[in-house]
A protein has these predicted regions:
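PAPS-dependent sulfotransferase catalytic core
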Residues: 1-61
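Short active-site oxyanion
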Residues: 2-5, 62-65, 85-86, 163-167
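Short His-Asn-centered micro-motif
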Residues: 6-8, 32, 67-71, 91-92, ...
Length: 219
């Protein structure tokens, strides 16, 4: 059952939060990386983005927490379905968030190879429905629009989730606020800080090569 709902957009420190939650005993934690690793769930997330009813318990299975997209798209539904779950809104400087998302996530979708495997195209279709069309209405490239969506999303979460249930969290703050919120001891290890642009770009290149190879295309 889901105990922690991450409502923050991708590129707000969600991978660091995933690893931190798992270290604190709230794992496994769902993240877009989990969808890519378990692609049998792509159809269910696509259907959810199209408005079909969702069996959240079945979809999440053994996961105890969820962060990043696709889950963050459905924060309202998840907060209703799991009324005892706590909500964490990861935040980041809006300009830095946009520049990071544009140069990683959006670029990965925009600069894809002409030929890809059917499975890779299913991933892209899901991402478009959940994020680029579903959240940004196909206008992420319009910076002003994207920043407005980002601000309105963060405001809505803070308006609709009660203060005693919500943590607004910048991962730069480290363990302190997170552990206080969850009522757990601060670990002796450093707070995980991962998923910078360079690491993301290298990871994306690996995925592109894999998708092209699956299509019979020489990378």
């Amino acid at each position: 059952m889901i105990n922690i709902i991450g409502a923050g957009f991708g590129r707000t420190g969600t991978l660091s939060l995933k690893l931190a939650l798992e270290q604190l005993g709230y794992g496994p934690c769902h993240h877009m990386d989990e969808v890519l690793a378990h692609r049998e769930t792509i159809a269910a997330w696509t259907s959810a983005a199209e408005g079909a009813p969702v069996d959240w318990d079945s979809l999440y299975g053994q996961y105890r927490s969820t962060v990043d997209w696709p889950g963050a798209r459905f924060w309202r539904e998840l907060a209703d379905h799991y009324p005892s779950a706590r909500v964490i809104l990861t935040v980041r400087d809006p300009e830095k968030w946009y520049d990071s998302a544009r140069s990683t996530l959006f670029q990965a979708i925009s600069n894809r190879p002409a030929r890809m495997s059917a499975e890779a195209m299913r991933v892209i279709t899901m991402m478009n429905l959940v994020v680029w069309d579903g959240v940004f209405k196909g206008c992420f490239a319009d910076k002003d629009h994207a920043l407005q969506v980002f601000a309105e999303h963060n405001a809505a979460v803070q308006r609709e989730i009660s203060a005693d249930r919500l943590l607004v969290f910048d991962v730069a703050q480290g363990w302190g606020p997170l552990c206080d919120f969850l009522g757990v001891p601060v670990p002796g290890e450093q707070f995980p800080r991962l998923n910078n642009r360079e690491a993301y770009a290298a990871k994306h290149r690996e995925r592109v090569v894999a998708a092209m190879s699956a299509s019979g295309v020489q990378p």
